[in-house]
Design a protein with these regions (language model features):
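Tetratricopeptide repeat
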Residues: 35, 41-42, 68, 84, ...
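Flexible helix-coil transition and linker loops at the boundaries of alpha-helical arrays
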Residues: 1-9, 46-59, 77, 93-108, ...
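Flexible inter-repeat linkers and adjacent short helices
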Residues: 1-49, 53, 58-59, 63-70, ...
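Short coil/turn connectors between adjacent alpha-helices in alpha-solenoid helical repeat scaffolds
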Residues: 20-37, 70-86, 119-135, 151, ...
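Residues within HEAT/ARM-like alpha-solenoid scaffolds
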Residues: 7, 11, 30, 34-37, ...
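Terminal, low-structured helical/coil segments at or just beyond the last alpha-helical repeat
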Residues: 281-284, 288-321
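Conserved alpha-helical positions within TPR/SEL1-like repeat arrays
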Residues: 10-28, 56-74, 105-123, 157-171, ...
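Eukaryotic tandem repeat interaction scaffolds
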Residues: 156-172, 180-253, 259
């Protein structure tokens, strides 16, 4: 096969891949099916090129397999999920056969394939799938920890997301030590994105979700604690809330409102923790978060935030009775 023929095949496949990705961004019920048709056609084209053509060609083949798997996983049924896992496995195996240090795109794509495989297993939820999903997330982190991954442009963000996936998974498990291991994963997610959350909204989203996991874990402990004892993780939880809401306010000042659902949850949780364990700081907590000068008028004036602040002020009233 000539290089001209390879280029022509890749050009045709690229058009199909872009079309399929556009379908996946749609909310129509049939969108994953339409996307799958595009990815299958692109895959059939790229399978015509000899596997030993080049490492980059293997990367392109794996991209087809992973996108195909993503479309199948979106369908959610048993059959498509099984097919998705098979497609993930084929793409992962293909990438593991090439020199990953040759191009930072290679380990990045492999880590994302392992992540999405883990998410598909987690969503399927059969017995043993949680263990398999955790192993897949761990494999993704192992790839990102290799020296050759150091050239990945968004490495810190990817590490944060992988640790966040582990935190979410572990927080839903009921095994001994699950909550402590979930807390550890959430803290590692925050360490990964430290100092970057005010620069990139995607990084901010990962950090805020990690704090959300920490608060959920803390809530479990608080539900078992007596009123006259302060659990060790109260300060950690309030720090997570305060830091997270400060980041939300920073993005609100720049006209980015995407974090409000997480912010409302963090605010409500923080108000309850302050009311129960540090009531002397609750009024200041409310004032800081209802200050439009440090966030935006749309944010502090939103119905959800107004209601959350009202609920928090009722906590002050009850405490002072």
């Amino acid at each position: 096969m000539t290089e001209a023929e390879v280029e022509e095949i890749n050009a045709q496949a690229s058009v199909l891949m872009k079309r399929g990705i556009a379908f996946l961004e749609e909310q129509r019920r049939e969108a994953p099916i339409d996307a799958l048709h595009c990815f299958d056609e692109a895959l059939e084209l790229r399978r015509r090129i000899p596997a030993d053509h080049s490492p980059f060609q293997v990367y392109l083949l794996a991209a087809c397999l992973f996108n195909r798997a993503d479309a199948l996983a979106r369908m959610g049924d048993v059959g498509p999920t099984a097919a998705a896992l098979a497609s993930y496995d084929e793409g992962i195996a293909a990438l593991q056969r090439i020199p990953l240090g040759e191009n930072p795109l290679f380990p990045r794509r492999l880590a994302l394939g392992l992540q999405n495989r883990g998410l598909a297993l987690q969503a399927r939820g059969r017995e043993g799938d949680a263990d398999l999903a955790e192993a897949s997330f761990g494999d993704a982190l192992a790839v990102l920890d290799e020296e050759y991954a150091g050239r990945i442009e968004d490495l810190a963000y990817l590490r944060g997301v992988m640790w966040l996936n582990l935190a979410n998974l572990r927080a839903m498990r009921e095994s001994d030590g699950a909550y402590e291991s979930a807390r550890d994963a959430a803290m590692r997610a925050l360490e990964s994105v430290s100092g970057l959350e005010e620069q990139d909204p995607n990084v901010a989203a990962a950090g805020l979700q990690a704090r959300h996991v920490l608060c959920r874990i803390c809530a479990q402990g608080l539900s078992r604690a007596s009123d006259d004892e302060m659990p060790d993780d109260v300060h950690e939880a309030t720090d997570a809330v305060d830091d997270g809401l400060e980041i939300v306010r920073s993005w609100e000042q720049r006209g980015v409102p995407f974090f409000r659902p997480l912010a409302f949850d963090l605010f409500r949780f923080g108000a309850r923790v302050y009311a129960r364990y540090q009531p002397q700081f609750l009024d200041e907590f409310i004032a800081d978060n209802m200050n439009a000068e440090t966030s935006s008028q749309d944010y502090v004036g939103s119905p959800e935030m107004v209601m959350a602040a009202h609920e928090a002020r009722l906590l002050i009233s009850r405490d002072n009775v």
